[in-house]
């Protein structure tokens, strides 16, 4: 029994010795000089230097080998290889016990999948992991990524970047404080101070967390998202000259989704606020079909609040509101389901023209309303004016109504099918304006403003 134990012990020692020897680095070259430095044995190897450890091979002009530490300093045209991996640097260091190489003199890595460069870097051969710092740049055939720090997991085709991160694929740019990118699946997760720029449609999305699935053409922003799209328009001045105007679309919500497919859809979900030139909206759900220049807002269930839309002095509510754009200006606006429209007079602020119906269609020219059509059980109250002098009001109802506008003022009202109309003189109306309100009349006070949106933008920037 004792003999067996002794033999087993000797065998284990021999295995351990072989394992330790297999981790020892070997350095050869044209010439070798042995030295004792501070009591430590070193070897300086010159000319056609080759360092090997297992599958790792490093060539350079000169190496200083620290024998007891199993380490070596590598000087001049350093090239490290393992399988398809190549690392280049003018000056580096190799840690045999850790199977790690390090350089602070500029590093270049190529594994036939990506190219990675930085001011300094480390590579762990036993883990197939790189850690690069300062002016980091990773690129392949479709994507370029830059950052202050980056960890690259070669076998996983995964990169984790930290600090001033930017990833660019030719059409989209993503900025973030931290970013995780999976090369094969083209999936990216971005965290903190996120900014997604689409160069194709000149739009930007800000937020604190983003998920981007490039192969699916889908992005999700679910923390403090803000969408911005700036359009350049030309306005004709009174003297016939043209001036450039910037028309910015703001959309704020709790969650945003972007689909980069044939429909080019953009979704804003929950607590949505929209602001663009002279119109604004609050709603539960907005779908923006960018290629079709169509925006649809709606409530998400039967008990939720209706979307509200403001256009200049008018306010509209309904179960859904569809905005049709042409050259980034409103062309048509449809309100469906329990529709209500009110317009405040700029000179008599307590007087509102009001219309309730099942459906409303508004038509615009150069951004100004010129016709409104109301369908389904239409009830209306319109205030009358003699010039700028108040002159009573008219209450009416019909199956459908058409209203003609000039300079945003009602000039003609046409009633169709079973019309009924009643006029109330000014002396009966003055001071009693609150008595002339249709059911469902509500003036909403939560209209988004430019100050609110720009303050939010400055906070996110």
In which residue ranges do the predicted regions lie?
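Bacterial Sec-dependent N-terminal signal peptides
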Residues: 1-24
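N-terminal amphipathic/hydrophobic interface segments
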Residues: 20-461
């Amino acid at each position: 029994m004792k003999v067996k134990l002794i033999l087993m012990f000797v065998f284990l020692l021999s295995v351990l010795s072989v394992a330790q020897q297999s981790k020892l680095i070997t350095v050869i070259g044209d010439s070798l000089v042995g030295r004792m430095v501070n009591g430590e044995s070193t070897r300086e190897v010159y000319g056609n230097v080759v360092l090997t450890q297992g599958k790792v091979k490093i060539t350079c002009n000169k190496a200083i080998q620290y024998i007891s530490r199993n380490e070596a300093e590598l000087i001049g045209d350093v090239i490290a290889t393992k399988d398809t991996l190549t690392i280049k640097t003018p000056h580096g260091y190799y840690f045999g016990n850790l199977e790690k190489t390090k350089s602070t003199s500029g590093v270049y890595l190529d594994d036939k999948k990506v190219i990675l460069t930085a001011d300094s870097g480390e590579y762990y051969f036993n883990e197939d992991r790189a850690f690069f710092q300062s002016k980091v740049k990773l690129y392949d055939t479709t994507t370029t990524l830059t950052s202050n720090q980056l960890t690259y997991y070669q076998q996983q085709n995964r990169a984790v970047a930290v600090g001033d991160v930017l990833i660019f694929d030719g059409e989209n740019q993503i900025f973030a404080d931290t970013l995780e990118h999976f090369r094969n699946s083209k999936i990216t997760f971005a965290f903190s101070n996120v900014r997604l720029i689409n160069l194709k449609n000149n739009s930007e999305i800000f937020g604190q967390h983003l998920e981007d699935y490039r192969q699916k053409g889908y992005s999700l922003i679910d923390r403090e998202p803000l969408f911005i799209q700036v359009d350049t328009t030309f306005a004709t001045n009174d003297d016939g000259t043209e001036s450039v105007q910037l028309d910015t679309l703001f959309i704020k919500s709790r969650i945003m989704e972007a689909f980069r497919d044939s429909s080019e859809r953009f979704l804003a979900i929950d607590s949505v606020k929209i602001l663009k030139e002279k119109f604004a909206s609050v709603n539960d759900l907005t779908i923006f079909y960018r290629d079709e220049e169509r925006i649809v807002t709606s409530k998400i269930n039967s008990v939720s609040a209706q979307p509200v839309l403001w256009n200049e002095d008018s306010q509209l509510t309904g179960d859904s509101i569809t905005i049709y754009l042409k050259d980034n200006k409103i062309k048509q606006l449809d309100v469906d389901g329990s529709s209500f429209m009110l317009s405040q007079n700029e000179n008599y602020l307590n007087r509102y023209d009001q219309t309730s119906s099942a459906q409303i269609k508004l038509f615009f020219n150069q951004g100004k309303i010129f016709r409104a059509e109301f369908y389904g059980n239409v009830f209306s109250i319109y205030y009358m004016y003699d010039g700028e002098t108040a002159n009573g009001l008219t209450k009416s109802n019909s199956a459908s109504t058409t209203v003609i506008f000039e300079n945003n003022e009602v000039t003609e009202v046409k009633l169709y099918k079973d019309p009924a109309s009643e006029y109330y003189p000014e002396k009966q109306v003055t001071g009693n304006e609150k008595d002339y309100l249709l059911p469902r009349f509500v003036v909403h006070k939560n209209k988004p403003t430019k100050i609110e949106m720009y303050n939010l933008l400055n906070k996110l920037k």
